[in-house]
Amino acid sequence: MKRVAAVIEYDGSNFFGYQGQPDVRTVQGVIEDALERIFKQRIYTQAAGRTDAGVHANGQLIAFNCPNDRMTTEDIKNAMNANLPDDVYVKEVFEVSKNFHPRFDVKKRIYHYFILTSKQKNVFLRKYVWWFPYELDLDAMRKAAKYLEGTHDFTSFKTGSDERDPVRTIYRIRILRLKNDLVLIRVEGRSFLRRMVRNIVAALVKVGLKQWEPEKMKEVLEARDRSAAAGTAPAHGLYFYKVLF
């Protein structure tokens, strides 16, 4: 029995998140249902990240044991895509070592967050960007983001329900102005707490609006108190972009 990994993209709009749950539609659920149709047995998968409801992915990485050694990776990819709904797509399948685990073996996770700052709403993008029709000072946001890079206790940027170790490492945060009034916030790190990226985005927007000085970010980080930070940016602007391992 060989072990394979698959790079998956999905539109999170109509999912209750990635992780399988009873009685609701999840990304893991539809993937494992597709695998069961292919292999005539339940196949359990592991993933590099558990995205929340409404969050999208360009490069989610999953792994599972394939019970049919005669199938090539291209065969597996084609079979999965033939059995998946049209809001999930397998981009690539490749063999990995027997003990590979995408959650623990990934060295870097990259998230993208898109903000649309145009005065007029774009109804076609309403599920895919955060429409925020205000001017943002990106230079101030970049200065604030520097305080978050490195290894820190990110208690101020986690949800109260996340009991994991709050110490995390952010390698880099880039903030770019794209065409058509789009702003991209790219966050690179080894691993993240639940809603950590969205909470960081909300805080950076406070700086961009000049409601906070860039130095406020250091103060919020050191407070280690969720109430010291801003709210949470909407889920639909966030994309699990890529993993490196």
UniProtKB/Swiss-Prot annotation:
Keyword tRNA processing: yes
Cited function: Formation of pseudouridine at positions 38, 39 and 40 in the anticodon stem and loop of transfer RNAs.
Quaternary structure and interacting proteins, as annotated: Homodimer.
Protein name per UniProt: tRNA pseudouridine synthase A
Binding residues for substrate: Y111
Gene Ontology MF, one: RNA binding
Key words of the record: Isomerase, tRNA processing
Reactions it catalyzes: uridine(38/39/40) in tRNA = pseudouridine(38/39/40) in tRNA
